[in-house]
Design a protein with these regions (language model features):
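Polysaccharide-binding and catalytic clefts of secreted carbohydrate-active enzymes
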Residues: 1-132
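Carbohydrate-binding surfaces of carbohydrate-active enzymes
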Residues: 29-38, 66, 74, 78, ...
Length: 246
C-alpha cells in the first residue's frame, strides 16, 4: 500500500494528506511509513483513505490476474483465459485485467438471503442481479457469459430452498436475452462427500440420474438450438444500439 501511495502522490506526503483531508481528527502523517491498512475496528474511518485502499487492492488483483493469464498463454498459446468474477461491484478490480480474452461472472440466485420480487421471489431470486451483471460486463470486451450458474439447491446459504420449477431455465434465458454468449454451471455431478456434498449438480450422486436443474438445462439447450436455426448468422445489432450512451 505504501509503495502504491508513494507512486500515486509522487513521493509527496503533503499531497496525500491534503487529498485525504487528514487535518480533521488530527490524522496528518509525517511520512508514508506511518500509513497502515484501514482498521475496521476503529469507530469511524477516513473515506478517502478507504477509497485509495480499494484502488490499491483492485490494482494488485488486476496485476495478479494479468500475470497468471500471461503465464498460461506462455505455455498454452492457443488457450483462451478468463476468470470467474464474483460481481460485488464495490470491488474495483472487476473487468480491469486486459490480458483476459473475455469476461465471465458467477451467479447464484436462490440461497436464503435473496428476497427476490413477489410471492415467489424467494425461490426465483431478484432478476435485477442478472440484468445488471449483463449490462455491467457486456461493454468491457463485448464477449461475456456466466461461468458459474446455480444448478439447483445449494448448501452454503443461511437457508437453502429449492429453486422454483422453471427458475433455472428463466435465469439462462435472462443471460442470453441480455447479450450473454455462454453459460456454464458449477458442477456436473453432485459428490458423495466433502463440504458441498449437498450442493446440487446437473446429475445426482450416481452420476447418471439427471437432477431437476439438469432437466432445465436440457430443456434450455433444446430451445436455444431451435432459436439458433431461426436467426441468420449475418445479422448484426442495429446502429442505434451501438450509439447508446449511459
Amino acid at each position: 500500500l505504501r509503495v502504491f501511495l508513494r507512486v500515486k502522490y509522487h513521493q509527496d506526503i503533503k499531497a496525500l494528506y491534503e487529498a485525504w483531508g487528514t487535518a480533521f481528527w488530527s490524522e496528518v502523517y509525517s511520512s508514508f511509513d506511518e500509513i497502515t491498512l484501514p482498521k475496521t475496528a476503529q469507530m469511524f474511518m477516513n473515506h478517502h483513505q478507504i477509497l485509495d485502499y480499494r484502488r490499491f487492492a483492485a490494482s494488485q488483483t488486476n496485476d495478479f490476474l494479468n500475470e497468471q493469464c500471461l503465464l498460461i498463454k506462455k505455455y498454452a498459446k492457443n488457450q483462451w483465459v478468463t476468470t470467474n468474477y464474483i460481481p460485488n461491484y464495490e470491488e474495483g478490480h472487476i473487468g480491469g485485467s486486459p490480458a483476459l480474452d473475455f469476461q465471465s461472472y458467477t451467479r447464484y440466485m436462490v440461497y436464503g438471503d435473496n428476497e427476490g420480487i413477489g410471492r415467489r421471489g424467494y425461490r426465483v431470486g431478484n432478476p435485477l442481479r442478472i440484468a445488471f451483471a449483463n449490462d455491467f460486463f457486456r461493454p468491457i470486451q463485448g464477449t461475456y457469459g456466466v461461468m458459474e450458474l446455480q444448478p439447483g439447491q445449494v448448501n452454503w446459504g443461511s437457508i437453502n430452498p429449492q429453486p422454483l420449477p422453471g427458475a433455472i431455465r428463466l435465469w439462462m434465458w435472462s443471460v442470453f436475452a441480455g447479450g450473454g454468449d455462454f453459460i456454464c454451471t458449477y458442477r456436473y455431478r453432485q459428490p458423495l462427500y466433502g463440504t458441498e456434498q449437498y450442493h446440487y449438480g446437473i446429475v445426482g450422486t450416481d452420476g447418471t440420474t439427471v437432477n431437476t436443474g439438469g432437466r432445465e438445462y436440457e430443456q434450455f439447450m433444446k430451445e436455444i438450438r431451435q432459436l439458433r436455426g431461426q436467426v441468420a448468422a449475418s445479422e448484426v445489432k442495429p446502429a442505434e444500439y451501438f450509439a447508446r450512451r449511459t
